[in-house]
């Protein structure tokens, strides 16, 4: 949250140069406050686990967040009861005419399938297109990030010979950016995917900006220049045991997976994993919710045209 300071306080310029969020008394006095409305399209097999992971991150902010859960209406969930889906999830037709402050679209275990061959690809495209007019900011995670980059910008992913699984070092590619406030120069983040986007094509695209990257895992955080779409190529929401659970699942299925890198203590799968990404994962979602949702969204959700002062400086 911002530090409120007197108008024209000399420290303001210094703090802003250090990427510290300050707000003048005048702006603070005119700021309307209400709960943020966030929609989550949950494509992961274990709905309840993913709900919990995302709500844990959304709940770790000073903002009140009202959450709606969205499903693909004609896709049966094999790992979650129909009662749970009917009780807590909405079909797209129930939200089509609504506007939201934020939308999160999760990953999905579809990394080796061409986008057009995904059974519900048309529904994904429809929701992405809808979001560009009805949502202030969209956070795409892992597979959803690849899918949206393909659909919105025509960028293709490259399939990997072996699943990329582990916790990798990333670095900032820019210093003064609202989304990166509080980030260390280097930080850790988990990945679990069968494909990657070319770092070169992402950097070359005039409508995109790469904010963080890894020598091993490639691009991690990519933001559209209109600030509406944030593409995160990994899983900041993963809990400590998620990569371990996926590894043992793949072993049981005879897939001969590599041991997740930099994850188990001493890289020994017989030992417990070490979670070293939760702090930055929480900060990522908190910064997105604050700077790209709360500070940007209009008080009246019928009007989706508002911009923040820092946008004018980009």
UniProtKB/Swiss-Prot annotation:
Top class in the EC scheme: transferase
UniProt-annotated location(s): Cytoplasm
Family: Belongs to the MetA family.
Keyword hit for Translocase: no
Biological function: Transfers a succinyl group from succinyl-CoA to L-homoserine, forming succinyl-L-homoserine.
Domain of life: Bacteria
GO molecular function ontology, one term from the record: homoserine O-succinyltransferase activity
Pathway this chain belongs to: Amino-acid biosynthesis; L-methionine biosynthesis via de novo pathway; O-succinyl-L-homoserine from L-homoserine: step 1/1
GO process terms (BP): L-methionine biosynthetic process from homoserine via O-succinyl-L-homoserine and cystathionine
UniProt: substrate binding residues: 163, 192, 249
Chief location of this protein within or outside the cell: cytoplasm
Assigned keywords, A-Z: Acyltransferase, Amino-acid biosynthesis, Cytoplasm, Methionine biosynthesis, Transferase
Record EC number: 2.3.1.46
Active site: 142 (acyl-thioester intermediate), 235 (proton acceptor), 237
GO cellular component: cytoplasm
One family name in Pfam for this protein: HTS
Annotated protein name in UniProt: Homoserine O-succinyltransferase
Keyword Transmembrane: no
Chemical reaction(s) catalysed: L-homoserine + succinyl-CoA = O-succinyl-L-homoserine + CoA
UniProt site (Important for substrate specificity): 192
Positions of the record's site feature: Important for acyl-CoA specificity: 111
């Amino acid at each position: 949250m911002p530090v409120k300071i007197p108008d024209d306080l000399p420290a303001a310029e210094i703090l802003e140069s250090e990427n510290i969020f300050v707000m003048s008394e005048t702006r603070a006095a005119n700021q309307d406050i209400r709960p943020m409305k966030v929609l989550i399209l949950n494509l992961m097999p274990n709905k309840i686990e993913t709900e919990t992971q995302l709500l844990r991150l959304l709940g770790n902010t000073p903002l009140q967040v009202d959450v709606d859960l969205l499903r693909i209406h004609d896709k049966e969930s094999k790992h979650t009861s129909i009662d749970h889906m009917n009780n807590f999830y909405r079909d797209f037709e129930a939200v089509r005419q609504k506007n939201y402050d934020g939308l999160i679209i999760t990953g999905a275990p579809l990394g080796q399938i061409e986008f057009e061959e995904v059974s519900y690809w048309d529904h994904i495209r429809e929701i992405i297109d809808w979001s560009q007019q009805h949502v202030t900011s969209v956070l795409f995670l892992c597979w959803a990030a690849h899918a949206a980059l393909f659909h919105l910008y025509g960028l293709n992913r490259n399939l990997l010979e072996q699943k990329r699984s582990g916790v990798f070092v990333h670095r900032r590619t820019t210093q003064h950016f609202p989304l990166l406030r509080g980030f260390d120069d280097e930080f850790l983040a988990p990945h679990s995917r069968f494909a990657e986007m070319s770092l070169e094509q992402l950097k070359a695209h005039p409508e995109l900006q790469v904010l963080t990257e890894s020598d091993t895992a490639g691009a991690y955080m990519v933001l559209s220049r209109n600030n509406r779409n944030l593409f995160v190529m990994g899983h900041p929401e993963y809990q400590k045991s998620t990569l371990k659970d996926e590894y043992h699942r793949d072993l049981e299925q005879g897939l001969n997976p590599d041991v997740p890198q930099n994850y188990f203590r001493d890289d020994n799968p017989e030992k417990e994993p070490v979670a070293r990404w939760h702090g930055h994962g929480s900060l990522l979602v908190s910064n997105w919710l604050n700077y790209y949702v709360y500070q940007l969204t209009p008080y009246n959700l019928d009007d989706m045209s508002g911009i923040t002062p820092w946008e004018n400086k980009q």
